[in-house]
Amino acid sequence: MGNVYTKDIKRVARELYDKFKDQASDKYDDNKKLVDEYVNVSSKKVKNRIAGYLTRYVKISKNKVEAQEASEELEEDLESET
């Protein structure tokens, strides 16, 4: 069963991803440093949750891009065969 995150944690993680897409990583420790650097939160638990959700969000985003590229390649292959 997955974790349930509040809207605030999701919002902050998405904003971080949008602003610092090139620095966001699929590694938790790297994202933890990113959160420490750019987010002003005093709670360690909240920082860790934001970093964890950001990690998952990056992985999901990468998978979507890869799937979209694969489907485009497949469409191109099908068009070239006909």
From Swiss-Prot:
One of its GO terms (molecular function) is structural constituent of ribosome. Keywords: Ribonucleoprotein, Ribosomal protein. GO terms for cellular component: cytosol; ribonucleoprotein complex; ribosome. GO terms for biological process: translation. InterPro entries: Ribosomal_eS17, Ribosomal_eS17_CS, Ribosomal_eS17_sf. The keyword Ribosomal protein applies. Pfam families: Ribosomal_S17e. Belongs to the eukaryotic ribosomal protein eS17 family. This is Small ribosomal subunit protein eS17. The lineage of its organism: Archaea, Thermoproteota, Thermoprotei, Sulfolobales, Sulfolobaceae. The gene is rps17e.
